[in-house]
Regions:
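Hydrophobic, lipid-facing positions within transmembrane beta-strands of outer-membrane proteins
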Residues: 1, 79-85, 130-136, 146, ...
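Face-selective signature of the C-terminal outer-membrane beta-barrel domain
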Residues: 1-111, 139, 245-248, 253, ...
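Gram-negative outer-membrane beta-barrel proteins
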Residues: 7, 23-31, 105-113, 118, ...
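Short sequence motifs at beta-strands and strand-loop junctions characteristic
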Residues: 25, 73-79, 124-129, 180-184, ...
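Short secondary-structure boundary/capping segments
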Residues: 32-36, 114-116, 163-166, 220-221
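Surface-exposed extracellular loop regions of Gram-negative outer-membrane beta-barrel proteins
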Residues: 62, 107, 142-187, 203-229
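Extracellular loop and loop/strand-boundary signature of outer-membrane beta-barrel proteins
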Residues: 68-73, 115-123, 169, 173-178, ...
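Gram-negative outer-membrane beta-barrel transporters
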Residues: 207-210, 227-270
Length: 270
C-alpha cells in the first residue's frame, strides 16, 4: 500500500505499508541398510572374494548374514510474518531521506529422530524482531552522489544446520546443532556514486557490520572427526571496501547496428 506525499521537488515522496509472509516446510529422510555377518568364523577368504557370491538371497535365507534397516528423519517448519512501514521524502533537490521499520515474528520448529535413534527430540525458535533502517542520499551534482545507510537485520540457521543428523560424505562428515541461535546484524555503509552517463557507474562503498552470536562451521575434535555449526562467539565485526564499475566500451547508433547489437558494456565488482 503506497501513499503519495507532496513535495516541492520531484514528487517522489511516499509512505509504504505492507505485510509479507514466508512459510517453509523442509523434510528429510535417509534410509540406511546394514549387512551384518552372522558366522564370522566361516567367512570366506578375502582372496578372490566377491560380494555378490556372499551377499545374496540364498545366504540371507540360510542366516549367513542379516539386514538391519534404519531410517533417520527430521522436519523443519519455518513461519515468518512481516509487517513494515517505510517513508521516503525529498526535502530539497539534493537531500532524500528514507526511514523504515519492520516487525518480524519468527516461528521455527525442528523435530528429529536421527543417528539410529540416538538423537531424538525437538527444538523451537520463537522471536520478535524490530528492524529499523535509515538511508540518506545527498546529490553533490547531476553525476555525483553520496549515500549513508544504517540498518538492523538477522540471520537464521538453515535446516541442515539445526538438525543433528550426521551426513557422511566421501571427504568429510557434518552434523547440525539444534541449539543454534539466530544472529543479529547491525549494518552501516557509506557509498559514493559517479554516473558518467545514465548507463555507466563508478561506485565506492565502505561497509561495517557488527554481528551478535555469529554462526560458523567448525571442526569438532573427536575420534571420528566431523564438522558442525556453532555460535562461535558473543560478537564479531566485518569491515571492508567494495568497488563497482560499469562502463560502455562502445555505443553505435541504431541505424548502424545491422545485427541488432548497438552497445557493448563491461562490468567489474570487487
Amino acid at each position: 500500500m503506497v501513499y503519495r506525499l507532496k513535495d516541492d521537488v520531484e514528487e517522489i515522496s511516499n509512505i509504504r505499508l505492507g505485510y509479507t509472509g514466508r512459510f517453509v516446510d523442509d523434510s528429510f529422510k535417509a534410509t540406511e541398510y546394514n549387512l551384518t555377518v552372522e558366522h564370522a568364523s566361516d567367512f570366506p577368504s578375502l582372496d578372490g572374494f566377491s560380494l555378490d557370491d556372499y551377499y545374496n538371497r540364498d545366504n540371507l535365507s540360510s542366516g549367513w548374514f542379516k539386514i538391519q534397516k534404519n531410517v533417520d528423519k527430521y522436519t523443519v517448519t519455518k513461519n515468518i510474518h512481516s509487517a513494515y512501514a517505510e517513508a521516503t521524502y525529498q526535502f530539497t533537490p539534493r537531500w532524500i531521506v528514507n526511514l523504515g521499520l519492520k516487525y518480524d515474528y519468527v516461528d521455527i520448529n525442528v523435530d528429529y529422530n536421527v543417528n539410529r535413534g540416538g538423537s531424538e527430540g525437538s527444538n523451537t525458535i520463537r522471536k520478535d524482531y524490530f528492524l529499523p533502517s535509515l538511508n540518506l542520499k545527498y546529490n553533490l551534482n547531476e553525476k555525483h552522489s553520496l549515500r549513508l545507510g544504517a540498518s538492523k537485520t538477522y540471520t537464521l540457521p538453515q535446516a541442515k544446520e539445526i538438525s543433528p543428523y550426521r551426513y557422511v560424505g566421501v571427504n568429510f562428515n557434518s552434523q547440525g546443532n539444534p541449539n543454534l541461535k539466530p544472529s543479529d546484524n547491525y549494518n552501516f555503509d557509506l557509498k559514493w556514486d559517479f554516473n558518467p552517463s545514465p548507463t555507466e557507474l563508478v561506485s565506492l562503498t565502505a561497509f561495517y557490520k557488527h554481528i551478535k552470536d555469529p554462526i560458523s562451521r567448525i571442526e569438532v575434535a573427536s575420534a571420528g572427526g566431523y564438522l558442525s555449526y556453532e555460535n562461535i562467539s558473543d560478537r564479531a565485526t566485518v569491515a571492508g571496501v567494495e568497488v563497482e564499475i560499469r562502463k560502455n566500451l562502445f555505443v553505435r547508433p541504431l541505424s548502424c547496428a545491422a545485427n541488432g547489437m548497438n552497445k557493448l558494456s563491461f562490468g567489474l565488482n570487487g
